[in-house]
């Protein structure tokens, strides 16, 4: 969706641990990168054995959706939360000042499943805050699974609290 709307797309992993990652999904190149989506991913633990090879590629910094699709999976996103959060200094820096402080950012939290014709494998809960110029594709299927809803709340809190380390404008800086 970012590439179709803005002509380019990239993923910059800002922070990553064994169970979470914070990423900048951007358009542009080099010093012209503009954050279109800031994503906090909480990986479902333990990782399903059928997803381990793809998971390693994702931990190496590759796009979650593109990696899973290349491995033959289809993606199913089940909406957990739809809300707005305010732009923080971190989002403003990643968006190269194209968003104002406190500006509303449309935000979704969803459970991502990697699916085959025979199986549906829970992979992650993802919270995404969107640049005002980038409206995300719709995926409105809702889940009531308690563990996923709890993970959604944790990911949303991390998305709201996330700050760039002192002096860091963008991970490429």
Listing of model-derived features with the role each one plays in the protein:
Residues 1-109, 113-173:
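N-terminal domain-onset segments
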């Amino acid at each position: 969706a970012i590439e179709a709307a803005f002509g380019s797309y990239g993923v910059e992993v800002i922070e990553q641990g064994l169970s979470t990652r914070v990423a900048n999904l951007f358009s542009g190149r080099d010093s012209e990168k503009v954050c279109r989506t800031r994503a906090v991913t909480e990986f479902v633990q333990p990782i399903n054995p059928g997803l381990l090879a793809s998971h390693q590629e994702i931990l190496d910094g590759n796009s979650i959706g593109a990696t899973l699709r290349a491995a033959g999976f289809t993606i199913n996103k089940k909406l957990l939360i739809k809300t707005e959060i305010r732009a923080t200094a971190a989002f403003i820096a990643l968006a190269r000042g194209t968003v104002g402080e406190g500006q509303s950012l449309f935000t979704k939290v969803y459970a991502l499943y990697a699916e085959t014709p025979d199986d549906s494998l829970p992979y992650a809960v993802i919270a995404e805050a969107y640049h005002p110029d980038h409206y995300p594709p719709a995926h409105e299927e809702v889940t009531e699974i308690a563990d996923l809803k709890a993970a959604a709340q944790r990911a949303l809190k991390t998305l709201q609290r996330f700050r760039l380390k002192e002096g860091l404008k963008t991970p490429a800086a």
